[in-house]
Amino acid sequence: MISDLTTLLFFPGGLSMLLAGMAFTWLDRKLLARLQNRLGPRWFQPLADMVKLLAKEEVVPAGVNRLLFVGLPVVALAGALTAVLYIPLWGLPPAASFPGDLVVTVYLLSLLTLCTGLAGANSGGRFSLLGATRTLTQLFAYEAPFLMALMGPALVAGSWQIALITAGINGRWLLFTQPIGFLVALIGLMGKLEMPPFDAPEAETEIVAGALTEYSGRGLALFYLGRSVEMVLGLTLVAAFYLGGLSNPVAFLLKTLGLLLFIAIVQSLMARLRIDQTVGLWWRYGALLVLLQWLVLWGGRWL
Amino acid sequence: MHTNEHTQKAETFIVPIGPQHPALREPGHFEFTIEGEIVTAASVRLGYAHRGIEKGTESRNWVQNLYMLERICGICSHIHATAYCLGVEQLAGVEAPPRAQAIREMVAELERTHSHLLWLGEAAHEAGFETLFMYAWRDRETVMDILEALTGNRVNYSANLLGGVKYDVTGEQASKIEQGLDYLEERTRHYLDVVTSDPVFIQRTRGIGVMTAVQADRLGVVGPTARASGVVRDVRVEAPYAAYTAFPITPVLAQAGDLEARFVVRLRELFESYGVIRRILANLPPGELVLKRMPRRIKAGEAISRVEAPRGELFYFIRSNGSDTPDRVKVRTPTLCNMASVLTLTVGRHLADVPMILVGIDPCFSCNDRGLVLKRGADHEHWTWDRLRQIGLDYYAGERGSGGVGGTSISPAPLPPCPPALLTGMHV
């Protein structure tokens, strides 16, 4: 009982995850800033942002469903924190595991995007509505290729259970045998986190802050935290699947940070894609390339 | 000013951009009717930053006005002062010495460099290309440093005087400018390469906001926006002023007329600027910086002064009644000429292209805002100054309650207070 509570509230879930999320957010912002010839935030900036946002009044716009408005950020963060339990954080075996937990995890990770979309549609503002439309459009664009990319290692290991997949990979670097899957998974993660060049849903020069325009205070803080947690989870998942499965925590952390550096570089290199260009990119190239990867994998089996 | 009313459906979805919006650095109000992501109609309302500068000139003397007009625009301040000085000199029947004219041109070209680099960053930011934004603005610091070394100021250089300029160029400064230009030239070449070869960026610029030469001519666009559509419209070439006869430039043209062409034209213009600055530094005419005597009262008459600001043609009309203050100063900035093209070009495009098309003309709202037309249904009568004043007083009296302003509020509502919704359109 006490050990279960510790798992949920402190490690690997709960508090440690929130701190890790903020640390990763800081590192992402700092790396991006240095690549863009800026100074970037100080190390405690994400924490300071959270403290400030949580302390501020949460303004609920008139005419919205109050329960949804307040509840959606909580669900979004809860979804991300639940997914923590099934993911091999820091290279350690996941805290919980059951057959098929890969699908559940991917679903839980999508909850944040879904909640963001609903929150935007619920807010009623024009920018929120447009942002919500774009968020959900983007969800349909990257989600399938992302899931398909994560299934590549699952095919190799012959299981849908994350613990078994990482065990089945057994130290092999699938990055070299499935480079397309690796790239699609990582870029899909960027789409999920609405990072440039996939930041059309929150393009500030067009629709202010997109779906979250009306959010302030606690709700905004929870959405931000959810996104931070999801960044750690996504990077962990890709590192575990494509960069040699479980290993000692220090080596694993280094691999995760390497991936973070990679996405920071990609973010700094590109202009924002229009939403129709994003959708086109994912379905014209992302999905087809992953399918190609699958065919190669299947073909390889018969050889 | 211009409204395309395609939509009569009740469920039109209008995206308001401005007066406060992250895409705008200055207040302006746009309404874009969209269907899905496609813009079907666009309208603009300007005038939020009307500062009454033209009226203000009438209560200041000729010299004081120089400093006020320079503050019309924070980016192209020098060119405003130049236009004014040239106009006043024309009225007074004098001409600044050749050395002063050359220095005027040099500062103007340095200003163009700073303005175009600033615009490059701004446009990259609208496209979500933050890295280019940061790098362009970092390199812009070089030209800001040059301007500071030359005149002591980064923004309002105050280089002009009636009948000349205030600052000379020393040999030391000249070599510093040369060094800066070398660096900027190398960087500009790199940026030109980026905007014409980066595949993601090209997706956002190539073939977007295409304006044909015919359209450009009909819409009356000016400056780089016109030149990107293949229309030769450059005051520096058509009607050379200052030292542009001695140190000419070649107008930079592009035929495509899309956003990419606007990037290319502005960046290639920088090379022209670097070249002409180098030539001026090498062949700076000797002589005085300023006329020995510039009259304090300017002869009665009218003058028109046109110059090429970084954004396009800047127009000054100056009328003197022979006193030490102008009778009328009228300023038309290039943004006004280009604004109509934004409304035309955004219709039928994606909402995501709108900020790009808007920034493509390099808009400058507060330079542009001169006043408002008060529209009241079919009431087209011309209001006298006294009546306009009374409306203003009543308007603010109504806002502040029954107190009134200086006791001038006589009846509760001789004219109904004018809500902002009635302040439509824009008057030049």
List the model feature ranges, each with a label.
Chain B
Residues 2-428:
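Active-site bordering "gate/hinge" segments
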